[in-house]
Amino acid sequence: MEELMRGKIQAYYGTDTKRLYLGDCLELLRKMKPESVDMIFADPPYFLSNNGITCQGGRMVSVNKASWDEGGDFKENHAFNRRWIRMCRRVLKPGGTIWISGTLHNIYSIGMALQQE
């Protein structure tokens, strides 16, 4: 399997045919060689951590996940989506594919960012 990263970055998990890296996606994408990835699966922030509460099993619980899920205004969130999608396109091989999960809170921005980038 060809080397994907510039420099020595240890894979979190790997076999002869695939590797999984654990870390900040923006930092890892910067270190990846252009057109080096066949498939990307992205589960970006949904921007739901807003100090709200929900009911789970009859108990009121916080919706906050962590700071990585806190959103700004629409422009900030959309700029973030454009940035990581642009970086994904750089490392994706011609003919490669990207799968992105989302909710109604972020998927429309992601769709628009895919068209813009």
Set out the residue ranges of the language-model regions.
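S-adenosyl-L-methionine-dependent nucleic acid methyltransferase catalytic domains
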Residues: 1-117
